[in-house]
Structures are given as structure tokens and as C-alpha cells.
């Protein structure tokens, strides 16, 4: 199973070509991978559109994917614990949503495609599975 952070979806919809958007293209084309979308990522991506036509295009594309709920009580507790452990190690994760995404991916053993520095310490210290 694979999921994609908003940092990559935003680049993808903006037409920015990166390693991560190429990985996303491959995941969209390859049905052997279960590509899922987290509810919090859906919100992060869609909230940024000012123009209705762009919002409609992104919403239509994202609606084709199964949406998973990231914010269960177990995931919230795991995200809070991970934040505290990283702070103790001298690392501050800036985004609570990134903590939820990371904790969900760790619990589900779901590979994450991202382009966001907040996920690096989660990978290094907590074994966040990432698609490389």
C-alpha cells in the first residue's frame, strides 16, 4: 500500500516535475500497488485552490482513490508520542498533520511518497516507510 503527502500532490497538480511526482505517476499507472489517500491530505490539497475549475479537476482526480481516515484515537496517541520522542531528541516537527500522516503510515506499514522535511526524522527515528 502507498499513500502520498500533500507536498507531492500539490507539485503534481502544479505540473512540477520531481522524483516524487514521477513516483506518483508510476503509482497511478501501476494497479499492482494499492494507492490510498488520507482524509487529512485530501483536505490539505483541496483547501489551496482559489479557482473553481482547478478545484474541480483536483477533486475529480482525488475522488478516484480510496480515502482512509488518519485521525483515529490510536493514531493520534501515536503521533503525540512520536512528537514528544522527537522533541526529546532535539527535533521539532512543524506540522501536526504530518505527524498524523507519519503515525498512520507506520501503523499500517504503508509506504509514503513525500517531499517534506518533517518526515525525515520520522523515517530515521521511527522507521516511517517511504518510497525511494
Model regions: which residues?
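Active-site neighborhoods of divalent-metal-dependent phosphate/nucleic-acid chemistry enzymes
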Residues: 67-113
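Acidic, PIN/NYN-like endoribonuclease modules and their adjacent C-terminal/linker elements
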Residues: 1, 102, 106-132
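Short, hinge-like loop/turn segments at secondary-structure boundaries
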Residues: 52-56, 86-87, 129-132
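Histidine- and aromatic-rich ligand-binding microenvironments
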Residues: 5, 37-38, 94-95, 116, ...
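Short, well-structured N-terminal submotif of metal-dependent ribonuclease cores
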Residues: 1-37, 47-60
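A generic structural signal for short hydrophobic patches within well-formed alpha-helices
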Residues: 9-10, 42-45, 119
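Amphipathic alpha-helical recognition patches that constitute DNA-binding helices
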Residues: 23, 96, 100, 118
Amino acid at each position: 500500500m502507498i499513500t502520498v503527502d500533500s507536498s507531492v500532490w500539490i507539485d503534481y497538480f502544479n505540473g512540477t516535475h520531481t522524483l516524487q511526482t514521477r513516483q506518483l505517476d508510476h503509482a497511478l499507472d501501476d494497479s499492482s500497488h494499492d494507492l490510498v489517500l488520507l482524509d487529512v491530505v485530501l483536505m490539505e490539497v483541496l483547501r489551496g485552490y482559489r479557482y473553481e475549475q482547478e478545484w474541480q479537476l483536483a477533486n475529480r482526480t482525488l475522488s478516484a482513490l480510496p480515502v482512509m481516515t488518519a485521525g483515529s484515537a490510536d493514531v493520534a496517541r501515536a503521533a503525540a508520542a512520536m512528537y514528544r520522542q522527537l522533541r526529546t531528541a532535539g527535533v521539532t516537527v512543524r506540522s501536526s498533520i504530518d505527524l498524523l500522516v507519519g503515525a498512520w503510515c507506520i501503523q499500517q506499514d504503508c509506504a509514503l511518497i513525500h517531499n517534506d522535511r518533517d518526515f525525515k526524522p520520522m523515517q530515521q527515528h521511527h522507521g516511517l516507510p517511504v518510497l525511494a
